[in-house]
From Swiss-Prot:
It comes from Clostridium acetobutylicum (strain ATCC 824 / DSM 792 / JCM 1419 / IAM 19013 / LMG 5710 / NBRC 13948 / NRRL B-527 / VKM B-1787 / 2291 / W). Key component of the proton channel; it plays a direct role in the translocation of protons across the membrane. It comes from the Bacteria. This is ATP synthase subunit a. Pfam families: ATP-synt_A. The keyword Ion transport applies.
Length: 221
């Protein structure tokens, strides 16, 4: 298993040369799959739900409940962004089920998600309490705590990035080691069940949960 993502092709824009890696291509494919799946599942919706519509309603209700429970009624407008993030990361985590290494073992991918979360956290705080209130929250505990409060703005996205990256990387490394031993005949199926299904779903839950908690705390400070 290689830790670095391979370059598939390059794109030149002016004097800049952009390397398009395997993980970037995989994300494009996953986005296309999600869009097509969403179109299929939401086509011809009816008042009396059929099996297909029931699946969609179950997913929507699950995300609604997650946001409501952890952020409250006034944050229900966050359902689309939280839901989109959760579904996208979940699909990326579960690619191991079809023999493709998860894109989330690439730190550039998890860093991208962490930056989106950081933007959401800070932009929401500024929108709700204003620029003045946001700056005041940094200085509210006295000058001695200003460096710590500023450091917190950096450590939150860093921790979100590393938590998801390390957990998915460890799973990929373990599976790679197993496949290089004679035990590969018996062990891959149950191990894939853990690392790709259980751990993959768990990491999605932890990531979006922390994003919601930090977003709410950013307003309450």
């Amino acid at each position: 298993m290689e830790l670095g993502a391979k370059t598939v092709f390059s794109m030149k824009l002016g004097s800049y040369n952009f390397a398009i890696t395997e993980t970037v291509v995989l994300q494009w494919i996953i986005m296309a799959v999600i869009i097509l799946l969403a179109i299929f599942l939401t086509k011809n919706l009816k008042k009396v739900p059929n099996r297909k519509q029931s699946v969609i309603e179950m997913i929507v209700n699950l995300i609604n409940g997650l946001v409501k429970e952890n952020m409250g009624e006034k944050f229900m407008n966050f359902v689309p962004i939280i839901g989109t993030m959760a579904v996208f990361i979940l699909f990326l985590n579960l690619t191991g089920l079809v023999g493709i290494e998860p894109a989330t073992k690439d730190i550039s991918v998890t860093a991208g998600f962490a930056l989106v979360s950081a933007f959401l956290i800070n932009a929401t705080a500024i929108k709700r309490i204003g620029v003045g209130g946001y700056i005041k929250s940094i200085f509210s505990q006295g000058p001695i705590m200003v460096p710590m409060n500023l450091l917190e703005k950096v450590t939150i996205p860093v921790s979100l990035c590393l938590r998801l990256f390390i957990n998915m990387l460890v799973g990929a490394i373990v599976m790679s080691l197993i496949y290089s031993t004679p035990a590969k005949i018996l062990l891959p199926v149950p191990l894939h069940g853990f690392f790709d299904m259980f751990d993959g779903v768990l990491q999605v839950y932890v990531f979006v949960l922390l994003t919601m908690i930090f977003t709410k705390l950013g307003i309450e400070h």
